[in-house]
Each structure stands twice: as C-alpha cells, then as structure tokens.
C-alpha cells in the first residue's frame, strides 16, 4: 500500500524529518476494527462518504479497486432492473387538488381584504406570492410522501432520490406544480403555473412558463463566460503563491469559533497556533499540531468554543506561504509539500464552482419570515411585557397590525386558573414582532411573537408600486391620510400621504372634455340621455372662402382660402413626354417658362416655381467666363443654384471646346499646337466643332483631354512683348496695341503659347452678353387680404458660373437663368402654398395657374358613445363657398349624456378650464331598506359587511348619501389602502377614469441580500467594488447621539468620540439608522443600513486603531479584521448555493488582495508618497529607521481587487501578460525594472522550469549557488528570499530585514556628512568596505560578502551616539 505513494513527493518533502512516520500512522494497511454490516440505502451522498473514507483510510489503490467493484455492481443490477421512465411513472399526488384549493381560498380572502381596502396592493402581492410559495413546498412534501408510501421503486423517484439524475425541483415540476415564474425584469408574476408537465400546461401558463425557460438558457450561457474569466483573474493574482518555507515562525493567528458547539470541517487540516487546554487545564492539542477529524471531535466534546489556528492570512513568509500556516494539502490530507503551487490550486477551487452559481436570484416577497422563529403560547394565561419593554406599532408585509420591540426584554405569560403551570418566559430581541397586547388574556397555542435571530436590523431598500384605479368616479380621501405637499431639491412639488389610510373612488360616469369645450349645464342638474353636457367650437384664424371637402375616415376637412393669386397673364401648357407630364407657362408676349412644380402639389415660401427658357444666353460650346467691371453677384453659401445678379453689366465669354477622352495615344489624328478647321477628326471618331488651335493632354501614353481654342496664333520672339502676357491669358481692350501688324477693334483675350515652331501669342475673340439689372416680368394679379398672409411673385436672375470659371464641355451651356419664385408674407411657417389649375373664364380651352394659401380645419364626425368622451354630435355652421371672417365659428361639437343621472362639476380654480365632468347615475347607488334607526350618518364611508342598522349589513363599499327612517342610500365606491409616504397622483375631489394611476406606494423590501447573488456577488467581493448607496460606517469609537430635526423626516446622527470631539454623519435619502441613541460604537461599525464598502471599512478600522496602537499593529489588526470579513462574505455566497470550498483557498486569494499599503509620508526613507508597496517591506524599512534614528514612513493599508492586484504585482512579465500590456511594459521600461522570475507565469513565458513541484528543489539549489561562500545567508527554505536574521555576528547591532528597493543611502539622518566625519575620526577607509548599516541593499542580492558590517564602523557610530547598542 505504501508504495502506491508517488516517488517524487518524498523528494519534495525531504525536510520533514518524521514524514515516514506520519505516513504510516495516516494510512494503515488494514483497518484495526473487524468489518461491520450496515443495512441501509446507499445514495449519492453515502457513496461519496464511502469513497472518501476508503481513500483516507486505505489509499489510492484500494479505493480504486473498491470503486470499480461498486461500478460493476451498479451496472449489473441496473441491467437486470432495466430502469426506464414511462408516462405512467409520473404519478400526481391526490393531495394536490386539496392543497391548491386551500391556497385559492387563502388568496380569495386576501383579494377580499384588498377589495375592502384593508391591505395595500403591495401587501396583497406579497401575501399571494408567499401563499403560493408555501403551497409549492407543501406539494413537494406531498410528492415525496406519495412516492415513499405508494411506489418506492418508481423509476423517476429512484433516479431523483439516489442522485443519479434530476432533483426534487425537477420532479416537482413533473408531478407537482411548475410554480411561480419571474418575468424578464426578475419580478415574480403573481399568477403561478398550477399544472405540471404530466397534466399539461394551459396556453397562458405555457407563455408564462417560457419566460423562465428562456432566462435559464441565457443565464447558463453568460455564466460559463463569466466564470471562466473569474478563474483567469484568480489564477493571475495568486500564481506566484508557492509553499517555499517550512515555518515562518509567526506568533499571529486567526480565531475559529464553533457554531452551536460544532466546528464541522473548518478545523480539519489546520495547525493550532497555541497549546489548546480543556477546562481543567489538560493539554488536548499541542502548538503546531495538525487537527484531524478525531481531534476536532475531541475539541467539540471538551466544549471548546474558539480555537486559534495558523492561516495563510497571518503567514509572515516573504511572498509565499509556509507549510505550517497552510496546513494539509486537501488532495492527500498531509502537510502540504514544499514547492506546492497553492495559489493556483486556490484559484481553481474558487473559480471552478462558478458555473454552479446562479447569476442572480429574484426578490420573492416574505424572505424575512423564513429567518424568524414563530413562538406560540404553551399555556393559557395573561401577557406581561415588563417595565423594560419599548414597543412601537408595526404593520407586517402581509398587512397584519402588530407591535415591534425596540429593545430586548423578557415577555411572560402568567398562567390563569391552573396554579400548577409555570409562567412561560419568552426572550424578545429588538426588532421582533409581537402579536399580543400587554395585559391581554390568551389561550394556549396562540401566535405570540415572531423572534428575529440576533439583533438583525434588516437592511432594506425603498421600492415603489403603482395603485391603478379599476372604476371611474370621484376621488375622496380619508381624513387620516393627511396629505402634505413636499418640495424636493429640484423644486418639484409632490403630494404625500402622512399616515396609513384609505383613498376612495366613488362611482360615476366620467366624461373627458376636448381641450376647448365648456360645460353648458350647471352642477347638480338632472340630465337625461342625449342632453348636451358641453360644447366645443372650432373657428377660423384668418377668414376667407370656405371649401368643403369629402369626408375621409372619422374626420371631415374644411378648407378656408385665405389668399389666392391667379397668374392671369400666363397660359398653362401641358406636354407629354416619355418621362412623364411636363408643364410650361407661356406669357402673352410668347416667353416660355418651364414649370418646376405640378398642379396639385404643395410648395413653401421662397421656392422657385418656374425657369425662363432663354436661348439668348446659350453658348455653342464650353469656354471661359469673365465678368466685365460693373457686373456683380450676391454672396451665396452654395453655388448649387447659381449666383444671384445684384448689378447688371456685361458678361464676357471666350469659347473653348474640350473633349474629355481616355484613349491610347496612337488614335490621335492631329498634333499638339496644330491649327485645324471645324469638322476635322482629332481622334478616331471624334470631330472638332470649331476652328482653332489644338492642345493635347496626355499621361503615360494615354490621351486624357483635347482642347480646341478659337483665335489666331502670331509668332513673336520679342521677350518684352511676351512678358506682358501669361499662359492663363489677359483681356485686351479695343485699340490697345498688342504686336505690330495686328489691329484690334474689339475686346481680345490674349494668351502666351510655346509651340514646336516657337513662341508666340494666341489672340482669341470674346463674345459679349448684356445682363439687365432686373428681369422683365409680365404683370400679375393677386388678391391681398386685409389681415393674414399675402403672396407675391418675384423674378431672380442667376448666373450659372463664377468669374474666371472654365467650363470643359463640347455642348453649349446656359450662362444666365431667370427664376420665378413665390414669396408669402405674414404666413405662419406651417402654412404651405397649394398649386391649382383653373379654366379661363372667357376661354374654357385655356388653363391658368392659381396659387392659394389654405387654412385647414379637421372637424370630428359624430361618434356614438365611447367609454370616456361620451356621444358627440358635430354641426357645421358654414356653407360651401361662403366667405367667413377671422374668428368666425366653423363647427360646434356637442358632448351628449349617455345615461340619465345628476351632473356634477368638479371644483375648478379660476382661469383653469374644466377638463372632466361626472354624472351620478342611478346604478351607482344602492338603496338599503331598514326597520330600526340607522347607526350611520350621511357622509360616512362603509365597507362590505359593516352594520347599517340593527340586523342590516352593507352589501357593498361606498359612501352614505342619504339616511331616512326607512332606507339608506349608499353611493358605490372602492377603497384603496395607501401606506405612509406614498405619493398621491390625485387630489381630493378629482375625477378619475378606469386605469388612471391613483398613487405610488413606497414600501421597504429587503435589500441586496436577495438581489445580487451568485457570480456577480463573488465578483463584486473579489474585485473589491464600491457598492452603490453603501452604508455609513463609524470612523472612530464613541457614543451615538441621535437628534430629531425640525422636519419630521430629518434626523441628525453624530458620534461623540473619546477625545470629546463630535463627528457628524450626513445621512442620505432613504437610509435607515441601525444604532440607537447612547449606544457605544467602535470604528468600522455600521451606523446605517446598506451594503458595506470594503475600502471604507478598512479606512475606518485603521483610523480608529491608529489612535490606540502603534502604526504597524493598527495596520495588521485592521487588515486582519477586513480579511476575516471578506473570507466570510465569499463563503456565504458559496454556502447559500450549496457549494463547499475550504477556507484556506479563499484566504490565499484575500492575502494577495490585502498585502499592499500606500505610502502617505515617506519620512526619511527613499520610498515615494503614493507608492503601493508590500507591508513587510515597509515594516523592514521602518525597523531600519528606528535603529538609525530616521523618521519612519507613514502609510495606510489598501485593499486591491484581483484585477488591480494582478497589475500591481512585482513581476511586470506576469502583469503584462494579463491586461494593459502596452502600459505595463512601457512603465517597466521607463522605470528600468527587473523581473526576478519568482512566479510560475513569468517562468513559463520565458521558457524556464517553473519553481514549483519538482522544479522547486532546483530553485533552492540555484539560490544556494548564488549565495556563494555564505550559504548561511539563506534561511532553511526561504524560497529565494535572503533572511537577514542569520546575519548577526556578536559585534553587530540587531540587523533588520532590509527592504527591497534600489541601492542608495537610506537616510537623511544621520547625514552623509556625519558618516564621513565618523569614518575619518576612526580611521576607516571608505573605499575598503561598503557599509551594510548605512546603505540600502540591492533588490535581489540582499547582502553580498563585502556588505558585511564593518566592526570598526559600528563601534565608531556607537561612540558618536548615532547608533544605540543593539
């Protein structure tokens, strides 16, 4: 058996002197006890325990053989049994219908309470959900009992029960009920799926069911990715944690407390930090002993409540963990081996179960009830609260009135009648609920109280729910509500209820009035069906001629022509082309304009309606444009529409024919600078249209462009004449001399040219176009209103090209366009101009263009009664073609009454229109006949079942309207309970329709406990995220002082600290105080509810301890408290999901997160303020300071999330391979960092053997060889970190462990001058040695041979008083 242990472990564990002995005691070859026979069912859990026991007792081989046999056994019987599932195996328990019936009865009762206004909407919802949750649980029990008693060998039951496949929650859905589902927002739908998959779901249930199914699939997909990333970050942060030492020798430890007298598995495999004695002083566990299950049991039986154990959290090994602090390796239940990569194991252990955690759980109302114990009376008696009791009224989440204890006290039930019974005593904790009154007589088995475990002041958050009205009518408040106007910081005014009370809606027929409608009947008037209740009129804004259009849909359009303009001087000519209809306007003198719009379209002011087709300004070819002096244009943002002429003048045009081609040069049929006649073929198949000089542009033997320029070429060698002209060209006026022999009697455009024949001038003729100052327009007639919009036609001349522009074209171009645009004045922007055609009055064959501005009024058609507007009847007050003035009524709409009743108008503020009115109908009232005198009076509000008169009860809810001796008239109403602080959306007397919001209930529900869970919560903890709306923590110990403010809600919270200074704490909206006045609090304690910000907690703990203890102790203690908190929080998440992880794994990760401190003040050290550095390093530096008398560095501990900790590691290779590669490498290069390749990652990247497992011994040997002739510099297994304790010859001072920073003088005091003087006085040659006491060692080689302290130097320093004797 022993030989089954791998050989390598003996090599790695070579430092354990008694490892062999241990080995034998842990793994006996045969059990001492004879085999025992156990007759019980072995399910999944029992199988797990069996294999685990075999492995721990008998080792790998025996366990493997046993597991193999068990497998064969299982398969053998599974083959014979032939287990399969058929539909018949899904047996629905008979109790199901009864259970569902009971639940429905409870819910009906709850709904009735809600209808009577006894509970709020929130309480109803919570109660319904709790009822179904409880029913579901009871149904699961019924399913279990049904299978157990009637069919224990049922296939489905066996599979789920043995753990082979499926679980109870799945079986429940198959044969119980599917249960409650959550919607995509995570809120529970209060309609449960009552059926199961065996019975089949209804359509509604199927749709609701698919919500949950989809959520499950999406969650699984996201969870896998999130969990993988979490594992990667954990591995990165902890990869360099390797067991490198036997024992770090720390005196620090952590405390493990027993839970209900039991330690469970929390002590197993941990080493005791001190001797553990029982109550009589006998030693149970010596110091540094591994606690195995039997020792753990012994501790429990000895009633030991807390044990100090060693932990990676308190291990003082430098950058690693020692064997004693880590304890057992859980793989083989032995002390961990040297070189074990415990960091990676920890990361895997925490990351791997990530996929098993749910992403989030949703809020199920009433979570709180499960955590509290209901106490019932055991005897009949009288309740006594005692003098200490402090209670206040409280309403439970289900709407039950109760009392809540504010302090802890003892409640007694004093027996009445029987003297033999003893009084029942109940310890009531603060926050517990009491369902009895002081002095009340009660029977036995009555619910007395609901005790909350511990002083749990629940962390709650505010949530809201809308109250929706489900009948139309008039709103009335109960007086108790006491609405109050509250103004928030932004100045918004809201109406809030101050007390719990009812908001009533009294039934009636409510009518919505259109915006401009006015009631025509006074209040309290009796109305019949068809009575006109209100009238709304529609009037014309500008007036004009009426046109009635055919009605479309449910409205009819009335058009009023406010302005029209007839283009009487133009004929409209229609021309059909293949691309569609074209329209032209022809004036009396024959000028033709192209119409840019078509009849029937709408145009806006300033739009061009037509262009003048003017052939006078059309050229034959392309060319160059020049403006003669005097011609000017307006500046325009864009040249798209041309340039508007501001001043007329002459436009000069130099023709030039340009062919843009893309052909091979071989196709060219003329030469560059050759004169050609019109019609010459210049390139194959391309002919010139004008005579002139050819210019050829080519690139890479490809023809690009051929230009033909008109004019005559004159050779000229005279440089003086040539210098007057450029290649771009220049205009020459008539009579101006150019060259001899050339007379110019017109304007010429002269260009300098160089041809193959020589230099010369090209004289080009210029065409002149005269542009008038304004375009000529035929006369127009138009109608102008006295008031309102008017129209005008305007002609605009636009030049197509700017001065100096070259138009490359063969075809002609249009140089000037004349546009006709329409302008409207005094029109509103939304008014458009309609284009119409009308026949000429004298000649019907001629059509004219008419431009009109229309005012369009939509008139509602009659409607037969709808739910909110009633019946409407609309009458037109005008006829077709009638002329109306501005303000004349066009149509009136009447709102007609639907049923007979009495009209009531709401109270309105003067100047505000009435938007709704109500008719109280006969069916909204109930007449209740009575014989005796009524016990109610007019104005009283009653609910179903209230007494009206002797023997007569109300049959409905509502308000008493009339009381006589024979009858009572009740107006039907509906009460809605609103809780304090609810926001009221309606005022007393408002009229509401069905579906309107009445109020917004503000209620408290448990916070975060059941909102963020599973993976996101783990991530939040390990990344040390700052939660939103975190709680306020006490900064320093002291006594709480709570003062009520002037305003009801405002409370001031302060703490009187030890030195009598007062710290005030600013409370945020909705924060509940968790402490009471006069309570003693310590730093880091919760003052208000909410999630804890771990960074704040560390700050508060450190700030408080810093005043009481030395800096180093305060830092260690505050870090230690935070570490325990973090470990417990992470464990809680995993435990809540049923995942078991050993504490030590989480401790390794948390150790990495809390190992750094931030330097606040460097003192005399060479550290930098703001630098993040290992706590150990600062400790060593400050120790050196205390020896040499320098000012120590001041620091604060910091908590880093796993990502940040990974990036802040000493190894830049590891950090760069994780995230932000460029930044990490750049910074490392600038700082000139060295990577000491301590972790696994760095070594893998470089390609070296990793310093763990079998590579660890090589690592130690390598370090030993580095140490050279001073092997004692290395501690026993320091894992490569020189331990300076061994550098202590008799004559040295007590040397500190020196920090790891660059080699420079550490100190400013004593100064370099002091040292120099001391050396000189004692005759020490400064070049002969390097002083360990005065210099900072190198980063890795902490002390080399020549750095050993010089005895003469040290004696000299002591004489000078600069060093105290160590």
Curated annotation (Swiss-Prot):
The lineage of its organism: Bacteria, Bacillati, Cyanobacteriota, Cyanophyceae, Synechococcales. Residues 1354-1366 have a biased composition (Low complexity). Zn(2+) binds at residues 248, 315, 322, 325. This is DNA-directed RNA polymerase subunit beta'. The gene is rpoC2. In cyanobacteria the RNAP catalytic core is composed of 2 alpha, 1 beta, 1 beta', 1 gamma and 1 omega subunit. When a sigma factor is associated with the core the holoenzyme is formed, which can initiate transcription. Belongs to the RNA polymerase beta' chain family. RpoC2 subfamily. It comes from Prochlorococcus marinus subsp. pastoris (strain CCMP1986 / NIES-2087 / MED4). Residues 1-37, 1304-1366 are annotated as: Disordered. InterPro entries: DNA-dir_RpoC2_beta_pp, DNA-dir_RpoC_beta_prime, RNA_pol_Rpb1_3, RNA_pol_Rpb1_3_sf, RNA_pol_Rpb1_4, RNA_pol_Rpb1_5, Rpb1_funnel_sf.
